Amino acid sequence: MTPLAERLKHLSSAEDFLQFFGVPFDQKVVDVCRLHILKRFFQYIRQQASIPQDTEAALFATYRDQLARAYRDFVASTPAEEKVFKVFQDVDGRQHVSVDTLRASLPARGTA
């Protein structure tokens, strides 16, 4: 395991990642979008055609750039608009539940 990978294992919060990579951030944005930022960051890393493995500095710079890009997505937009998580991808985050389905899920009157 590379020294960078070893250090990344100890990061847990969005703030940890942003501070580690030196990405300036507004705490208000992170408070609302922390999970979205991290998920988008990892999506960008997976989508990248080639990730430099020749030097730690190149790898660090690539990761920093992708994290900054993910953070910027949520400065300019909202989690619902970015649709990072499946709940936002499914029919614009809405699911149809019929009244009949709701009635069927309720206990029968006179019981309980």
From Swiss-Prot:
Transmembrane segments: none
GO terms, biological process: nitrogen fixation
Highest taxon of the lineage: Bacteria
Keyword Secreted tagged: no
One Pfam family this sequence matches: NifW
Membrane in keyword set: no
Record's keyword terms, sorted: Nitrogen fixation
Quaternary structure annotation from Swiss-Prot or TrEMBL: Homotrimer; associates with NifD.
Family: Belongs to the NifW family.
Function description: May protect the nitrogenase Fe-Mo protein from oxidative damage.
Protein name per Swiss-Prot or TrEMBL: Nitrogenase-stabilizing/protective protein NifW
Organism: Burkholderia vietnamiensis (strain G4 / LMG 22486) (Burkholderia cepacia (strain R1808))
